Amino acid sequence: MTTTENALTPDVRNGIEFKVADLSLADYGRRDIELSEQEMPGLMSLRREYHDVQPLKGARISGSLHMTVQTAVLIETLVALGAEVRWASCNIFSTQDHAAAAVVVGPHGTPEEPRGVPVFAWKGETLEEYWWAAEQALTWPPLADGTEAPANMILDDGGDATMLVLRGAQYEKAGVVPPDDEDDSAEHRVFLNLLRARFETDKTKWTKISESIKGVTEETTTGVLRLYQFAAAGDLAFPAINVNDSVTKSKFDNKYGCRHSLIDGINRGTDVLIGGKNVLVCGYGDVGKGSVESLAGQGARVTVTEIDPINALQALMEGYNVKRVEDVIGEADIVITATGNKDIITLEHMKAMKDKAILGNIGHFDNEIQIARLEKSGAIKTNIRPQVDLWTFPDTGKSIIVLSEGRLLNLGNATGHPSFVMSNSFSNQVIAQIELWTKNDEYDNEVYRLPKHLDEKVARIHVEALGGELTKLTKEQAEYIGVDVDGPYKADHYRY
C-alpha cells in the first residue's frame, strides 16, 4: 500500500467497499476466526441470547478498533444481532491482514464475491492512510432511493473516530479548520489536513454525522479520557459509555491481557532473553501491573515509576523498586511505557539509555515516547525487521532498539491479547451498544458506565466457560449483607 491517489480509493466488489491487503487471505482468516469463536464464550452466548430479538436492527455502527481475529468475532456478533457495520483499525500496525480479508469476504462469501462487512485496514498503514481509513469507516453510502444514511453509532478504541466526528463538526461550525501549530505532531498535522480537504468539498459532512450519532462506546483508558474532556468542555454531542472501566474489562483485558501479550511482543520482536535483565516499567495501573507481573515471571529485575502514591505503594508491597526515570534509565536493559500519558520517555532519556537497550510502549498512543523528537534529532534509523528499528546517536555511537515506532508493541510485534480475555471486553462492548441503541432516550450527552449487574453477567458467562461453580447465597445470607440473592453483590465503589 502507498499514499498515492489510486491507493486511497476504496475497492468495490459485489457491492461491498473495502481496502485490505489481500482478499485471498480470507480462508486462512476464517479458520482462525472459527478457532477464536471457541475461546470467546461471552460473544457466542450473546449471539444465542439475542439472535431472535435482533436488538441492533437499524444500527449503522462505525468501528475503529484493532482489526484482529478477535475483533472479527466482535464484528460478526454485531452483525448477527442486526447491525450494519463499517470498520477501520485504530492503530497503523495492529491489523491482522488475514482477519481483515475474512471479515470482508464473510462466512458465506468468496474473494470473488464477498458478502461480509466493509473494512478499511491493513498492517503498516501510513498516517495518511490511517486517517483516510478512519474517514471511510464513518462514511456510509446513501440508501437505494438516494436518502442519506449516516453512521448512527460509534464503537471506538482510543477515541480517534469520535474525535474525527466531533472536531470536524466543531470546525465546520467555526467555518475554518485551525492552522498547524509548530508543536503539532506529524499525526495531528495529517488529521488537520484531512479535515481541511473535506471542508473544501463538503462543509457539513461532520455536522450531519454528529447529529445522526446516537452514542459511542469506548474501549480504552486513553479514549475515555478524551470523552471526559469533550464532556467537560460541553463538546460531547451524544451519549457515551465508558466500557474501559467495566470491571470485566479493566481488571481482565488490561491486566491479564497485557500479562500475556507484552512478553509475546518483546520475544517476537527481539528474541532477547528477559530473565536476569533490568527492566523499567513506567506506570503501575492495570496495564502496568499485568506487564510487570509477566516480566517478573520471566525472571527480570523490575523497577517501576509512578506518580500516584497508592499505585507506588502497591508496587513496593509486591516487591518491586519504585524510582524516577532519570535515576535508573541508564541501568535498564528494557524500558516499557504503560501510562496513557505523554512525554514519559524523552529524547534525553533515550540518549542516556544503555547501548542496544530495548524501548517499547504498551500504552495506547506513540507519544508516551518522544518519537517525533527522536526522528528530528539526527539519530540514524536502521530497520532490523518489521516494526523493529535500531536508532543510533552519531555523537555517542550508542544505539537503542525501538519496537513498533513507539506504538503498541503487543499488537505491532505480536498479535495482541488472547481471545478469551477479549471475550470479556467485547461482551461489554456489545452490551453497551445494545444499551445505547435500545434505550437512547434514557441517556444525556454524558459519559456513563455499564451497571454492575451487566458486569456480573459477563463474568458469570466466563466463569462457567472455565468450569467454575459459583456458590449460591441463601435468602438469609443475602439479607444479612444487604444484597439480592442474584446480585449485584458489590457496591459501585467496591475496588476489586
UniProtKB/Swiss-Prot annotation:
It comes from the Bacteria. Gene3D superfamilies: Adenosylhomocysteinase-like, NAD(P)-binding Rossmann-like Domain. Transmembrane segments: none annotated. Binds 1 NAD(+) per subunit. Keywords: Cytoplasm, Hydrolase, NAD, One-carbon metabolism. Substrate binds at residues 68, 157, 219, 249, 253. Its EC number is 3.13.2.1. Belongs to the adenosylhomocysteinase family. This is Adenosylhomocysteinase. It comes from Mycolicibacterium paratuberculosis (strain ATCC BAA-968 / K-10). The gene is ahcY.
